[in-house]
Amino acid sequence: MPSLSDEQKRRVRALARSTSDAKIGKKLGLEPGAVKAFREQEAAAQRQRRERVFKILLPAVPLLLLLLCEALLRLTDYGGSLALFVPAETAPGYLKINENVGRRYFPALAVAPEVSNDLVRTAKPPGTYRIFVLGESTTAGYPYLYNGSMSKMLQQRLRDYFPDREIEIANLAMPAINSFALRDLGPELLAQQPDALIIYCGHNEFYGALGVASTESLGRWRSLINLYLELQQFKIMRFLRAQIAAVQKWFGPAHSPAGNANATLMEQMVGDQAIPYQSEKYRRAREFFTANLKDLINAAQRQGVTVLLANLVSNERDLPPFADIFNPVTPRATFLAALERSRQLATQGNLQAALALCDSLQQVDAAPACLHFQRARILEGMGRFAEAAAAYQTSRDLDGLRFRAATDFNHGLAEVAQATGAVLVDVHAAFTRASPHGLIGNHLLLEHVHPNLHGYFLMAAELCRALQQQGMIAVDWDQTRARPDSVYWQERGVTALDEEVAAIRMAVLLNNWPFVPRERSWPLRYQPKDYLQSLAYAMWRREQTWEKVHVLLAEDYEKKGRLELAVKEYEALILQTPHNPSPYIRAGLLYANLQDFDRAQDRMLRALALTPSLEAYQVVGAILLNRGQPAQSLPYLQKALQLAPGDGRTLYNLATAHLMLGQTEPARTCVAQLEKLMPGSAEVAQLRRSLASPQPAR
């Protein structure tokens, strides 16, 4: 059958919509079979094209649906922003740490760990030195937080060393996170152009968010966990995560700690409570830890960011191990009875026999942490402190409930520093030197891992020393600018109110598992005895903010005439919220009342660097005038008058300044205004008499 020409094909296609094959063939002089064959061929080709398109589009349909869902979720702002930094509403031109950023890491518990309120400029100014501090609850300063953190204490020292340079320190630490979170935050924090990172992290590698033994664990593969975190930028991923968590909660164990609203976060995060030293799970946690840190540090150094990596401290002497792990063949009851006998011998003063009994038990089973803790106690009693320290550390390392990082993790930090070129800061050595007999315990720590204020103060001093030794910020540091440690301690900005809140947090922590058995745990029974305690309790219950309770307490002190205590509250606010002019002004007024005019002037000038203020202009002008500096006082008094044109005290000081400078006409104008405002005033009359006999200009 002859094939159709292109023209015939075109005409067949045109007629095919309304004409039969026979009529088309007759009209075009073609055999009916030729038309039918052509149309069947066309139909087959069209079917093939449709199949190809379908095969191409079919895999794209789920992707298109996901994109549509993502668009809808973004349109409705599902879950809000989980970005690390967001604009600070109260400080235009600054970024704050997003209070919701921690929600990335707790899909099942749906909690948002508390973050600091540190600010950084949106656009980093030239010459600014920017430091980000990364880590867990210790790095955040728990249980004091705020000015009780090592970052705030470090900032005090750096401000003295570099008074003419802006140094930004933002503490990005969050409770209950670990190295996975630090690695995940890396790209966002590096985008803000830090000059240095300070990292103190490692105690949460087992039970922190996504840790290998936590209730939030996502499995054995580090690459998959990090991929999961990277996908959190998509809202569809967060939506699916929330649905899965809801199903798990619905069908999960009814009485698990993770589902207990009364359990502490520490308790809710624990999955596996018995992890042997150097077990597969233990080694995996350590490998994840070092690999995550290497990823973060390498990324930072590619950007020219210096990294300080601090090693870890924990309570070695004064915290018995939480969980013992025995060899399966060990007769546990017999073993523990013998260990109790060793304790009795030690109590009776027979230390040598007690130690010998421990040594014999070690031949039976060296795995239980309690054995090494008892040996350490005996060795300490014998004055063999170096051996005692080693035994305490062994006890800590063998503790099956891994809330304290083992010595092996500090070795890992040293390996990371060696491999990446990060600066290793030996905080553990500093704590050892500062502890009686070199045994780290309650002298510097509150419980298992969180330092007391002296501990945080020591960490800040050690970090400052490391910055100086490395020539960071500047090659040469002017040592004459540093003040004694005693001054930094007095000005640390942690008041009795902060210590009371910390005491409440500690009471809750230490009266719950694992510090006491679950059956003996109890909810907080706190009865405030005075106004300070009522404010502390309100803050702990999140009924009042940190800033508000300090202001309320300061106002109460002022009403009672306790100005020295009131000014300490405002100084705490200045340290924590340096971009807020209000506490500078309130402190300046109190210092003026206390006759401390140097501090009054300093605080008011710092307030004026932030915003115009009538009170600040008035106080600075008055101080300069009283010091016999009328020319320097004039600009401040004139600005005060612009803000309050009819203010009598400002007019009086202005008139006095003009008279002291021999400027009679401006003085006369001020006196005339004063006479209208304050008719019959003896002070104004004295000014009028002074106009009649002006003083020589000063």
Predicted regions and their residues:
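Short coil turns that delineate tetratricopeptide repeat
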Residues: 194, 365-367, 400, 544, ...
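Register position in tetratricopeptide repeats
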Residues: 347, 381, 559, 593, ...
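Serine-dependent acyl-ester chemistry module
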Residues: 148, 203-415, 419, 427-442, ...
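Canonical tetratricopeptide repeat
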Residues: 374, 552, 586, 619-620, ...
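Membrane/wall-proximal cationic-aromatic binding patches
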Residues: 79-162, 434
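Helix-start (N-cap) detector for alpha-helical repeat units in TPR-like alpha-solenoids
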Residues: 334-335, 368-370, 547, 581-582, ...
